[in-house]
């Protein structure tokens, strides 16, 4: 519809395959350097002319004579000058596909190569996660990891939560109490304040206190993060809340972002709380922080709030993003399955 550049850009996460299509797709060396496969789809000039006439007459209300004049005056000469050289340069084209969709052999070759490339990239990503795990395995926890002090109250709540015979209603009640404490620790760790003076009920007396310096917000990592949302609303009733759905591909172990709803001005917020009750390998946490960074949120304004986390997962997260803060209640085995959300949500 629009043959012009637009100021707005869209960030795409977790795609398996991105197709860049256009007559100048292989023209710029900076673009071709980022491509895994470069395909030139070849078609007969007469076929291209007939398609163009049909499109312009049917959809744009033009006449046939004007289409033919434009073809010979501008389109065809510029094709031979700018587009066809992309076909001739070996460095710019991996495969030339004649006859378009009718060429079943070429399509099969392309799909086979795509599968091989995806498998190779998946292996590289898994190796990188393992490398991060080995680097972080023996490292001490970062100072930005805040472990909630285990008072008698918290130890008692943990005892109830860890009991498999507890009723779901009681589990929700006590987990919500603990969620309030976790969110309070998160606000203490990440929010910025400014001096503020109020007049007290006593005439002539003032109280010099603090006021939030900006708007806080939270991102709930679905589906487990919804377990902490009740605690969030009790601490910050009017807090703006976004959503992310990140799931781990069980075949490859890679996190995949399926959905996100984030405030457009989140980069200006005082503090952003990321809520997820459990962290194991840290893959979903890494991706969620990456998404916030892509939306302009500085690392030092991100606080990851979780009930339990594996040490290696924490160290992976802090190795990649050392300036964020993490609030955690319990440190557990790295591969503990996600049972909290199942117990809380009842499914």
Each model region followed by its residue ranges:
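Conserved acidic residues
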Residues: 16-17, 35-36, 94, 216, ...
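Conserved nucleotide-binding/hydrolysis micro-motifs of P-loop NTPases
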Residues: 25-26, 43-49, 54, 102-105, ...
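PRPP-associated nucleotide enzymes
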Residues: 116-347
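ATP-dependent small-molecule kinase phosphotransfer cores
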Residues: 1-17, 62-73
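ATP-dependent NMP and nucleoside kinases share a basic, alpha-helical "lid"
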Residues: 5-58
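Short gly/ser/thr-rich secondary-structure transition/capping motifs
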Residues: 1-4, 18-23, 73-77, 196-202, ...
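Catalytic phosphate-donor-binding core of small-molecule kinases
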Residues: 64-67, 73-77, 302, 310-315
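NTP-dependent small-molecule kinase module
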Residues: 13, 54-57, 76-146
């Amino acid at each position: 519809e629009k043959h012009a550049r637009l100021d707005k850009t869209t960030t795409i996460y977790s795609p398996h395959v991105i197709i860049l299509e256009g007559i100048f797709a292989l023209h710029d060396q900076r673009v071709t350097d980022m491509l895994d496969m470069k395909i030139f789809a070849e078609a007969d000039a007469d076929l291209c002319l007939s398609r163009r006439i049909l499109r312009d007459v049917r959809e744009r209300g033009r006449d046939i004579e004007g289409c033919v004049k434009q073809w010979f005056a501008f389109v065809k000469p510029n094709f031979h000058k700018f587009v066809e050289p992309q076909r001739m340069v070996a460095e710019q084209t991996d495969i030339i596909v004649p006859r378009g969709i009718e060429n079943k052999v070429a399509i099969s070759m392309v799909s086979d190569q795509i599968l091989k490339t995806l498998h190779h990239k998946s292996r590289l990503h898994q190796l990188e996660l393992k490398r991060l795990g080995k680097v972080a395995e023996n490292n001490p926890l970062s100072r930005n990891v805040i472990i909630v002090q285990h008072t008698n109250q918290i130890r008692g709540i943990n005892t109830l939560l860890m009991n498999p015979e507890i009723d779901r209603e009681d589990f929700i009640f006590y987990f919500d109490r603990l969620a309030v404490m976790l969110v309070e620790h998160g606000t203490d760790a990440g929010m910025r304040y400014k001096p503020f003076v109020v007049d007290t009920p006593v005439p002539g007396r003032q109280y010099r206190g603090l006021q939030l310096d900006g708007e806080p917000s939270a991102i709930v990592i679905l589906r487990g993060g919804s377990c902490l949302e009740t605690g969030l609303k009790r601490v910050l009733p009017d807090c703006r809340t976004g959503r992310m759905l990140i799931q781990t591909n069980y075949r490859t172990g890679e996190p995949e972002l399926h959905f996100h709803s984030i405030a457009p001005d989140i980069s200006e917020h005082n503090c952003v709380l990321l809520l997820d009750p459990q962290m194991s390998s840290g893959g979903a946490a890494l991706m969620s922080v990456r998404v916030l960074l892509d939306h302009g949120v500085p690392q030092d304004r991100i606080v990851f709030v979780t009930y339990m986390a594996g040490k290696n997962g924490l160290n992976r997260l802090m190795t990649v993003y050392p300036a964020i803060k993490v609030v955690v209640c319990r440190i557990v085995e790295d591969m503990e399955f996600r049972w909290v959300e199942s117990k809380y949500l009842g499914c």
